[in-house]
């Protein structure tokens, strides 16, 4: 996720104390902030920001970047009392998970510079429990040159149209999909997109749907449209090369960059990695199929990756100042669109020079459905657990019914533990 897609803080005035309200600086020199982030594909951008912040303020950002083991590292540090000054998480359900540990940003002046829609996923009962890092989209990315060279001019919107395009590509010797199935987070992102509109049409909205799942009054096995999920995963696997279950993020980005594969399910965060391999790659964005309902096909669009400040940090004011810098300084406002090349939560920020970001905005402006990342409302821990179950399905270990049974059991167990 990288998931998944996900801002950063600093002093707004260089000569001032790191602490507000008359508090004294705890050390003779500038503070050192500890940060625990994920998205290792952004390591160079993190490093650039760290260097810029150090140069402007003298404050050191001691940043650790993890990915697959991120949650276990964060949980271990929280349980041991070694909470980072600043850490990342998802939005939505993670607001509840970390509410006892994080600082409420609602009274900070710089928060008013953020887009109200970006704040929805971090707001609970009027409290703003995190800082939306990136505004991201995920769906199917395609190589425009490969499509054009093989005469695919009508972009697919339905499962049948994806199948027809894949057949044509495979007949030409092109691998239609690079699956990414080895990454636990790719499968949930792919799967839940296939039922996103169903949640609203049949279950009264995302919050209501998740509430019923949490209470056990609804199960995945009750949702008839889960066939959309299995049909889509089967299609990707069928046209996903000789070893679809061994494909990871690096495989996806490499194959689409070099034109050896035509389509990947990923987010706009993948573009920078693709361009490191092929700077001139011509990329486009496709809607994700919802069975064969062309009108329901859309993209997933939200701000999920979240920065949180530990409320009991000894460097609390320094951490708040860093976020203020991220939001208001020239470098901070340009960091996401200019360096990360993604959409910023800052309302007045410039648009990034990114094909996928530009296509995202264009599609939404033309009325293409943009669905929120509602699966991030599921209890913390479900993404990896349910992703592993879907990996088992794609590997042929379980059939559809056994997979639904496993999804129901895993969700119920995690939801009960979260109560």
Where are these regions (language model features)?
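Conserved N-terminal structural module of periplasmic/extracytoplasmic solute-binding proteins
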Residues: 3-9, 13-94, 101, 110, ...
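Extracytoplasmic/periplasmic substrate-recognition and gating elements
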Residues: 51-52, 56, 60, 80, ...
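C-terminal capping/gating helix-and-loop segments adjacent to ligand/active sites or protein-protein/ligand interfaces
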Residues: 62, 300-301, 338-345, 359-413
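Short helix-initiation/N-cap motifs at beta->coil->alpha
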Residues: 65-73, 159-163, 244-258
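A structural signal for short loop-to-beta-strand junctions that line the ligand-binding cleft
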Residues: 84-85, 112-147, 175-179, 296-299, ...
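Hinge/lid segment of periplasmic solute-binding proteins
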Residues: 90-139, 148, 163, 169, ...
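Extracytoplasmic/periplasmic solute-binding protein
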Residues: 138, 163-215
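Glycine-centered hinge/linker elements that transmit conformational signals in sensory
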Residues: 167-168, 210-245
């Amino acid at each position: 996720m990288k998931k998944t897609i996900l801002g950063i803080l600093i002093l707004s005035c260089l000569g001032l104390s790191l602490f507000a309200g008359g508090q004294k600086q705890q050390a003779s020199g500038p503070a050192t902030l500890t940060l625990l982030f994920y998205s290792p594909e952004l390591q160079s951008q993190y490093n650039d920001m760290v260097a810029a912040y150090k140069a402007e303020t003298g404050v050191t950002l001691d940043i650790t970047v993890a990915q697959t083991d991120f949650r276990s590292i964060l949980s271990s540090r929280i349980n041991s009392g070694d909470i980072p000054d600043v850490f990342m998480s998802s939005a939505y359900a993670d607001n509840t998970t970390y509410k006892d540990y994080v600082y409420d940003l609602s009274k900070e002046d710089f928060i008013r510079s953020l887009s109200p829609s970006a704040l929805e996923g971090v707001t609970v009962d009027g409290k703003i429990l995190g800082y939306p890092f990136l505004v991201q989209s995920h769906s199917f990315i395609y190589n425009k040159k490969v499509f054009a060279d093989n005469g695919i001019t009508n972009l697919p919107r339905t499962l049948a149209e994806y199948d027809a395009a894949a057949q044509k590509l495979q007949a030409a010797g092109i691998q239609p999909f690079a699956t990414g199935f080895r990454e636990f987070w790719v499968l949930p992102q792919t799967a839940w997109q296939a039922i996103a509109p169903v949640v609203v049409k049949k279950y009264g909205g995302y919050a209501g749907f998740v509430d019923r799942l949490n209470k056990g009054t609804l199960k995945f096995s009750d949702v008839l449209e889960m066939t959309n999920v299995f049909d889509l995963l089967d299609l990707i696997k069928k046209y996903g090369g000789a070893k679809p279950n061994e494909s990871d993020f690096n495989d996806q980005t490499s194959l689409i960059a070099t034109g050896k594969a035509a389509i990947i399910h990923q987010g706009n965060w993948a573009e920078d990695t693709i361009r490191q391999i092929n700077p001139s790659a011509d990329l486009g964005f496709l809607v994700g199929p919802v069975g064969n309902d062309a009108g329901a096909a859309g993209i997933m669009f939200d701000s999920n990756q979240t920065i949180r400040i530990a409320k009991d940090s000894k460097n609390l004011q320094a951490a708040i100042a860093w976020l203020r810098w991220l939001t208001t300084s020239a470098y901070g406002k340009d960091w996401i669109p200019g360096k990360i090349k993604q959409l910023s939560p800052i309302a007045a920020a410039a648009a990034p020079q990114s094909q996928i970001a530009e296509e995202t905005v264009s599609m939404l402006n033309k009325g293409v459905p943009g669905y929120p990342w509602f699966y991030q409302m599921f209890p913390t821990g479900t993404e990896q657990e349910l992703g592993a179950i879907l990996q088992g399905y794609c590997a042929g270990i379980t059939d559809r019914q056994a997979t639904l049974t496993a999804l129901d059991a895993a969700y119920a167990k995690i939801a009960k533990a979260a109560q």
